[in-house]
Amino acid sequence: MKRVKTGIPGMDEILHGGIPERNVVLLSGGPGTGKSIFCQQFLYKGVVDYNEPSILVALEEHPVQIRENMRQFGWDIRKLEEEGKFAIIDAFTYGIGSAAKREKYVVNDPNDERELIDVLKTAINDIGAKRIGIDSVTTLYINKPMLARRTVFLLKRVISGLGCTAIFTSQISVGERGFGGPGVEHAVDGIIRLDLDEIDGELKRSLIVWKMRGTSHSLKRHPFDITNEGIIVYPDKVLKLR
């Protein structure tokens, strides 16, 4: 089975070679755990290191802010967008505001699953995308809880069907044991959970792979850091929670 390299140092070792191609992975965690950074790094490195065009569906943040946040890590996606290798789908602004008018891909009503999927299909075909990030599916559950799981299933079907590999981020509350959204964990191929826990008076970051269809993987909790160049995972270390 073909693997998709994450572009995150140490992560592919934990996944025994990378994410199986066409898998949709749920990346869940509380506030400040690094979900958006992980997702953005997966997409950016996909383009620059593996020549795999990428798309970020922005449901929680303005595209202008996303570009600025990524630039802080040295990830200049403006150039990649101009080259047709990276695309942001604006599903945040509802097409309102002067900045939104300059976006190439806009979902005017993110609650309309058909419009969201149509815009995503167009962008995938336009740039020949191989990687997709949706940040975050939690927004779907907040806006339309009854239809959200169906929308996640539809997105998975479209993304996998078009040969792409994806990360869906999902917000959970501090201390929550689930993965965010009722039943969403059953709609995806893999689950990676990011945590931020206080240990001996200090906040420590860690991640654990709960499931990953198509591959074996580490069952241990591994520490990771967020540096000025992105996330680094330590596959040879294990973090024990008290």
From Swiss-Prot:
Keyword Coiled coil: no
CDD domains on file: KaiC_arch (cd19486)
An example molecular function term from Gene Ontology annotations: ATP binding
Keyword terms: ATP-binding, Nucleotide-binding
Gene3D superfamilies: P-loop containing nucleotide triphosphate hydrolases
Entry superkingdom: Archaea
Segments forming domain KaiC: 2-242
Keyword Protein transport: no
Binding residues for ATP: 29-36
Pfam families according to UniProt: ATPase (PF06745)
Family: Belongs to the UPF0273 family.
Name recorded for this polypeptide: UPF0273 protein MJ1359
